Amino acid sequence: MLDNMIHEFKKKKVDYLSNIKDPLNIKDEFYYPDGFDIEIFSKKSLLSSYKKISSSFDYEHVTTFIRSSNIFKKHFVKSQKKFQKLKLSVDTKKDLNNVKKIFKVFASNIFFSFEDIFKNKKSLDIIKKQLIR
């Protein structure tokens, strides 16, 4: 997924590209689950943001400023499916244990993909059972 996003970033020639939900399109339900967030931005946009931001929040979370500003060229990559209720980030010990279970499902194929996780019934059951927001 990351390779595809980098390719899109270069192809689109944007300042910022992401697969997270577009803040200007809040009704959109086609975005990736937590844990698969990718944000790519140019050095130029980062330096420009640094000069323009004034809040400590924006210093800490610079992409929030880039996403909400009209001065940058942005592109949001949508998913083909609705994943908004699924969470696959590792924020707690329980999350880590659940991700370990998913890795065990794919023990014979260490090169599994994002799509493989959501096509496989066992891994999808783990996610749905324990990682629903």
PLM segments and residue spans:
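A C-terminal functional module that forms or caps the active site or interfaces directly
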Residues: 90
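AAA+ ATPase "lid" subdomain C-terminal helix
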Residues: 106-107
